Amino acid sequence: MAAHMSRFVRVILPTLMLLALPAGCIKHSVIPDEPDVVTISVSNSNPLDMTVYAVNQSMRIRLGTVSTASTQRFTLSLHQISPTGELQLLADPVGSRRTFTSEPIHVFAGQAVEWVLQVDLRQSTLTIRS
């Protein structure tokens, strides 16, 4: 019995471990290889600096701050916002109590959103490019 157990430990166990090794190297992710991100570019023509958020229903994701007369680019993963890709952008002027929210948009992986904030925020423009 000891010889049989010794052969198991010496030959069969290492063979089983070698056979199981490739299974540990298989990628088990359900996320596709290509990134599920959108690029959001915000140009600020308003005299106030803006803190920009992506909004989905009641959830806000802070993207960053855009200074006056500058443009910032942000990357947002789609699974951070919603499975449908629906979101709104919110501009919160620094030092003001008023905020401005874009109309709802639907974005898909790889798309680029360009938001140009004007002096009168109601005249701001939003463009989606593939």
Which residue stretches match the model-derived regions?
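Sec-dependent bacterial lipoprotein signal peptides
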Residues: 1-25
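Bacterial Sec signal peptide processing site at the extreme N-terminus
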Residues: 19-39
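Extracellular beta-sheet/turn segments enriched in Thr/Pro/Gly and aliphatic residues
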Residues: 26-31, 98-99, 103-130
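Asparagine-centered strand-capping/turn motif at beta-strand->loop junctions
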Residues: 42-46
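Short beta-strand/loop motifs in extracellular/secreted proteins, especially
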Residues: 48-52, 85-87
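Short amphipathic beta-strand segments in non-cytosolic proteins
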Residues: 53-60
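Exposed aromatic-hydrophobic patches
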Residues: 72-79
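A short, solvent-exposed beta-strand micro-motif common in secreted/extracellular proteins
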Residues: 82-95
